[in-house]
Structure formats: structure tokens, C-alpha cells
Design a protein with these regions (language model features):
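Amphipathic alpha-helical "lid/sensor" segments that cap RecA-like P-loop NTPase cores
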Residues: 106-169
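A short helix-turn-beta junction within AAA+ P-loop NTPase domains corresponding to the substrate/partner-engaging
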Residues: 67-83
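Conserved Walker B catalytic segment
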Residues: 3-60, 67-70
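Conserved small helical "lid"/interfacial subdomain of P-loop NTPases
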Residues: 81-109, 117, 121, 125-128
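Phosphate/oxyanion-binding active-site loops and adjacent basic polyanion-contact surfaces
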Residues: 32-35, 85-89, 229-232
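Conserved nucleotide-binding/hydrolysis micro-motifs of P-loop NTPases
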Residues: 30, 59-63, 85-89, 130-131, ...
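C-terminal leucine-rich, beta-strand-based interaction scaffolds used for sensing/assembly
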Residues: 146-287
Length: 287
């Protein structure tokens, strides 16, 4: 069987060598590190000989190919696809308003762009909700001005449909052998360390990239009493990253970079929920 696998691998590499094609490896960042090493090392000589390979990955994992094989350092060029800029996001609202013959009042467009976390989909959600709330469903004959009177209520109502289930699953954590310690927060509620970590992340803004030190500092600011030990916080972040990859549908909402000790909020909808959603503590899995 091993010989058969080896022969298939050799045949695949031979086909790549002989054909004038570009090899594309999608979602490279999701592949287990050990498999990443095998892939890169198998392709390394062909790449040195001129084979063109594209590894598609989220921005903070763009150099995984170099991390697993240092000899690739001078052979990798990153082509970045950034989040949408504020100007690009505002254009969505401006063009939509023009098409519907409406005007968006005051500073609303600017605020929409700021709250979208670089996501055109969130920007479209804001515009859609604005129209529905003002009963605009088609192009108007007479121009109207649309506004959001209560910003907290407006953004909060949208948060319910973004990433509530992801938050609840991460706050629940893995199955525990015993009840987790409940901690008291300055906002009045109590919750375990999983809820605390999410609340600490939210307290950062949330920022979409946080170092371990930033998360721990935010924990100190929101908690009454002693902060959990460093290894406890790190363990929880690692567990959350695993849950995000294995238990949640679709793309993981967050990702912990072990080497850099940085947490990345990959999903703009999740970041948005942490800012505007109702962060309710949950009981641990067994208690």
C-alpha cells in the first residue's frame, strides 16, 4: 500500500513537472502543520525549477509556507487582498441611496463604514436595515431622507443575526469534568473563564488582532478580583481556537497563532457581535 501511495505521489509530481500549469492550494492555513510540511517539501524542488504554486490563506497565515520550510523564504511573494477601505464601504451606501432616490441623513454613512469591520456584507446589512426601518422597498418617486434615530438599538438589532451562535458555543467551552470557577465582573454579571476571555476581547474594541498581553490586560480591567494565571488564559484561547475550527460551521471566527502569541478575529461578523451583541454568560457544560 505504501509503495502504491508513493507511486501516485511520484506520478502527480511528474505530471506537475511536465505540464505548463499553475498549482493552486486553497485554504492552506487549515491544513495540519505536519501535512503542510509534506506538501511544501514535496513541491520545493519543482518550485526551484520553475513550477508556479499559489497558496491561498487568510492574511495572518500568508507565510505559513515559509514557516514550515525556511528554504522557501526567498521564493514566496505575498499578494495581499485587504479588507475594504472606508471610502469603498461608503460608496456602497452612496450608490444604493442614489438608486433608491433617498438621502442618508447626517453622519450615518460614515458611522456605517466605521462599524463594518472592513466587510461589504455588513455594510449592505446596515443599508438594508435602514431601508426596512424606513419602509423603503423600491425606488421612490419623491426623494426622502432616511435616518437612524437610536444608534444603540439599530446596531444591536443587527448583531442578533450575525454571530450569536458562535459566541455561545465559544463561551460554553469544551465539556468540563467539574464546574468552572465563576468570576465577578465590573459590569455586575458573573461568568467562567471562557466568558471572561470573550468579554476581555470585546473590551479591546474589539481589535481584530490582539497579543496575549493585551487580552490579559483587558481581563484585569473588567474583572473584580484576581486574574487567572497566564497558562490558564492561554489554554482557554487554544481551546477556543480548536472549537472554532472543529465545531463551528463555515470559516473559523477566530484563530490563535501559537508562534506569535496573537489572536486573530478572522470573521468581521464575529467582531461585530462582540461589540454590539448581548454578551450573556453561560453555565459551564456540566454545571
Amino acid at each position: 500500500m505504501r509503495r502504491q501511495v508513493r507511486s501516485k505521489k511520484a506520478a502527480a509530481l511528474k505530471a506537475l513537472e511536465d505540464g505548463d500549469k499553475v498549482l493552486v492550494v486553497d485554504d492552506f492555513h487549515y491544513i495540519d502543520k505536519g501535512i503542510q510540511i509534506q506538501i511544501v517539501r514535496s513541491l520545493k524542488q519543482l518550485i526551484f525549477d520553475g513550477l508556479r504554486v499559489v497558496f491561498l490563506a487568510v492574511p495572518h497565515r500568508a507565510y505559513d509556507a515559509v514557516r514550515v520550510e525556511r528554504e522557501m523564504t526567498a521564493r514566496v511573494t505575498q499578494i495581499s487582498i485587504p479588507y475594504w477601505s472606508q471610502d469603498e464601504l461608503r460608496l456602497i451606501a452612496e450608490k444604493g441611496a442614489s438608486a433608491l432616490n433617498v438621502e442618508i441623513a447626517g453622519n450615518d454613512i460614515h458611522e456605517f463604514a466605521e462599524e463594518a469591520f472592513g466587510s461589504p456584507h455588513l455594510m449592505q446589512r446596515f443599508c438594508h436595515s435602514l431601508c426596512i426601518n424606513n419602509e423603503v422597498r423600491e425606488t421612490l418617486e419623491k426623494k426622502r431622507i432616511l435616518s437612524t434615530d437610536d444608534k444603540e438599538r439599530f446596531f444591536g438589532s443587527i448583531a442578533v443575526d450575525t454571530a450569536k451562535s458562535a459566541f455561545e458555543r465559544l463561551a460554553k467551552g469544551p465539556r468540563a469534568r467539574s464546574d468552572r470557577i465563576q468570576r465577578e465582573f465590573r459590569t455586575g454579571e458573573t461568568g467562567d473563564i471562557y466568558y471572561g476571555v470573550l468579554k476581555a476581547i470585546a473590551a479591546s474594541g474589539p481589535k481584530t488582532t490582539l497579543s496575549y498581553e493585551e487580552i490579559r490586560q483587558r481581563f484585569k480591567e473588567i474583572l473584580i478580583g484576581d486574574v487567572p494565571q497566564a497558562h490558564e488564559i492561554t489554554r482557554v484561547i487554544q481551546k477556543m481556537s480548536g472549537i472554532a475550527k472543529e465545531d463551528l460551521q463555515g470559516e473559523p471566527v477566530l484563530d490563535w497563532d501559537e508562534e506569535e502569541s496573537r489572536l486573530h478575529l478572522v470573521d468581521p461578523f464575529f467582531a461585530y457581535y462582540l461589540k454590539w451583541g448581548e454578551l450573556v454568560p453561560r453555565e459551564s457544560a456540566d454545571g
